[in-house]
């Protein structure tokens, strides 16, 4: 017998949200009591735009490093299939304001100071699709997202 489940992200009204934003999706406790938080890092407005794969791939690799440099507890940051943002999975309790501040600082570094030598995991040995990267695209999208501002609320624009 198949268990009935509800996938939270499919219940979200993608028309009502106002990207870019950070949204707490869930807080769950593991079998030993450890808290895991799941955040929606929405960089572009759903159904209006999407980040091209090569740029998103490069942003993904950079966020894997830059987030860890700015906050403890990162488990994973994985892109949404719709290419509008990322799931950020963290150990412990974090606020959307904390996470939005970290994302903003990371995007500022991507936009302003990152060079190709700073992008981790771009060789055939270290990446499953190493030819599909674009630092130019990553930088342009980071600038556009920063120009719009990052909110710590998905429905009201409350910029960090």
Swiss-Prot record:
Family designation: Belongs to the LuxS family.
Enzyme kind, highest EC tier: lyase
The protein, known as: S-ribosylhomocysteine lyase
PANTHER family documented for this protein: S-RIBOSYLHOMOCYSTEINE LYASE (PTHR35799:SF1)
UniProt cross-references to Gene3D superfamilies, sorted A to Z: S-ribosylhomocysteinase (LuxS)
Assembly and oligomerization: Homodimer.
Catalytic activity annotation: S-(5-deoxy-D-ribos-5-yl)-L-homocysteine = (S)-4,5-dihydroxypentane-2,3-dione + L-homocysteine
Molecular-function annotations in GO: iron ion binding; S-ribosylhomocysteine lyase activity
Top-level taxon of origin: Bacteria
InterPro entries reported in the protein's UniProt record: LuxS_sf, Metalloenz_LuxS/M16, S-ribosylhomocysteinase
List of residues binding Fe cation: 57, 61, 127
Gene: luxS
Function text: Involved in the synthesis of autoinducer 2 (AI-2) which is secreted by bacteria and is used to communicate both the cell density and the metabolic potential of the environment. The regulation of gene expression in response to changes in cell density is called quorum sensing. Catalyzes the transformation of S-ribosylhomocysteine (RHC) to homocysteine (HC) and 4,5-dihydroxy-2,3-pentadione (DPD).
Swiss-Prot/TrEMBL keywords: Autoinducer synthesis, Iron, Lyase, Metal-binding, Quorum sensing
Cofactor list: Fe cation
EC number(s) stated in the UniProt entry for this protein: 4.4.1.21
Species this chain originates from: Streptococcus mutans serotype c (strain ATCC 700610 / UA159)
Cofactor binding, note field: Binds 1 Fe cation per subunit.
One GO-annotated biological process of the protein: quorum sensing
């Amino acid at each position: 017998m198949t268990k009935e489940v509800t996938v939270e992200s499919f219940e979200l009204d993608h028309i009502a949200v106002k990207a870019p934003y950070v949204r707490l999706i869930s807080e769950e406790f593991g079998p030993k009591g450890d808290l895991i938080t799941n955040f929606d890092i929405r960089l572009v407005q759903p159904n209006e735009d999407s980040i091209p794969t090569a740029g998103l791939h490069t942003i993904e690799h950079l966020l894997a490093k830059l987030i860890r440099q700015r906050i403890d507890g990162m488990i994973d940051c994985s892109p949404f299939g719709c290419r509008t943002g990322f799931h950020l999975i963290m150990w412990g309790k974090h606020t959307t304001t904390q996470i939005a501040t970290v994302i903003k600082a990371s995007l500022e570094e991507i936009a302003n100071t990152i060079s190709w030598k700073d992008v981790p995991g771009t060789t055939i040995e270290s990446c499953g699709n190493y030819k599909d990267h674009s630092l130019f695209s990553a930088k342009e999208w980071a600038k556009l997202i920063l120009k719009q501002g990052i909110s710590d609320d998905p429905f009201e624009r409350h910029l960090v």
